[in-house]
């Protein structure tokens, strides 16, 4: 088991290469054109930032300094 203490990083690299190959293989199976053709319509995004747009605390650029 002395070799495992010395070369554990090789096992980690082999594992990561295997994960990377599986990810690439799975991503090749995805048909992005079919997904984009049948993409569901998203509802409009509601946020309440429009209330704060008028209450901007930044000074105006055209105002002279006091």
From Swiss-Prot:
Residues 42-66 have a biased composition (Basic and acidic residues). The chain crosses the membrane at residues 4-24. Signal peptide: none annotated. One of its GO terms (cellular component) is plasma membrane. Residues 39-66 are annotated as: Disordered. The keyword Transmembrane applies. It is found in: Cell membrane. Pfam families: UPF0370. It comes from the Bacteria. HAMAP family: UPF0370. This is UPF0370 protein YpfN. It comes from Salmonella paratyphi B (strain ATCC BAA-1250 / SPB7). The lineage of its organism: Bacteria, Pseudomonadati, Pseudomonadota, Gammaproteobacteria, Enterobacterales.
């Amino acid at each position: 088991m002395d070799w495992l203490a010395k070369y554990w990083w090789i096992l980690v690299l082999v594992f990561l290469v295997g994960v990377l190959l599986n990810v690439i293989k799975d991503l090749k199976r995805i048909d992005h054109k079919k997904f984009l053709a049948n993409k569901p319509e998203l509802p409009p995004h509601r946020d309440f930032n429009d209330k704060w747009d008028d209450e901007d605390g930044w000074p105006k650029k055209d105002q002279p300094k006091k």
